Amino acid sequence: MSELVDRNVTTPEASLPGGPADLRPGLVPETPADRDPRRSTEPLWRSLTHGRGLAGAVLVGIVVLLGALAPVLAPFAPDEQLDAAFLLGPNSTHWLGTDDVNRDVLSRVLLGIRADLVIVFFAVPVGAILGSLIGLVAGIRGYTDVVAQRVFDVILAFPALVLAIALTAVLGPGVRAIVLVIVLAEIPVFGRLIRTSVLRVRELPYVEAAVVSGASTGWVLRKHVLPNSIEPLGVQLALSMSVAVFIEGAMSFLGIGVVPPTPSLGSILSDGNRYLETNPLFAVGPLVVVSLLTLGFLLISQAFAHARRL
């Protein structure tokens, strides 16, 4: 456990009753996080019940609900070619009209929401978990910190879209490339966040006392580092969701994302961009959904950040 402290504590108080020499993992002075780790998350979840947090939760909730119920709500199969006219405007049968190959735009948007959410809700947590694990190891310092920092620097040197184009050239377009781009983009973000938390918490007096008393690295990480990292993780997770929505939409818009005929919001927006004058809702529909989803996650992130400052 010597890695967690850079100096030995040899103060006279160490020999006094109640001093660091008497401390054991079960006797370390309690902190708010020690008394109830859930307290770290309560302000965050309460922020979703009012103001910006509530507005963001409602927006994200509506889009998620539409995506979850897409197979039920979609009036037609997403790739079904209909008997109606090409690029038909909105009407009672086709609320958002039809596209350039005579498919119902509303059905494709609903199924596109579902595809996008599956990608985002899978890729971001995977990137967060991998980045957090690397950040925990790096925060203990040693050669692992240097290696992790250099890896983070290399990844961050490439803008997300440049990284997407490079990976697509190797792997080909598709869901696998999108997921990998999002995961790689999030690893250094969460890695540096957790590393900073570890470096900050390890210098606190009660953590140093626990280390001197013989507490293991795992115990210190579990009791002190992780509870104190929940709030910044929540803020970054919400923000990363909005970034991931943009990355997926941009990749599909450029034709290097979800492969047709599978619908995605970015690919529908790309197709509709060519027919703005004929059927503007062809492009406006997916654009509104992407905007609402991104705005919702941003509002949640801002609400979480405000709750941390209270």
Spell out what each predicted region is.
Residues 1-61, 298-310:
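Transmembrane alpha-helical segments of polytopic membrane transport and secretion proteins
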Residues 95, 99, 136-140, 144-200, ...:
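Generic hydrophobic transmembrane alpha-helix motif, especially the helices
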Residues 98-103, 141, 155, 209-228, ...:
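Short helix-to-coil transition segments within interhelical loops
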Residues 105-109, 117, 151, 194, ...:
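Short hydrophobic alpha-helical segments within the ABC transporter permease transmembrane module
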Residues 105-137:
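Transmembrane alpha-helix signature in integral membrane proteins
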Residues 156, 167-170, 197-198, 247-290, ...:
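Glycine-rich helix-loop "coupling/hinge" segments at transmembrane-helix boundaries
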Residues 162-166, 174-186, 233-268:
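Non-cytoplasmic
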Residues 185, 231, 238-239, 280-310:
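C-terminal transmembrane helix and the adjacent membrane-cytosol boundary/short C-terminal tail
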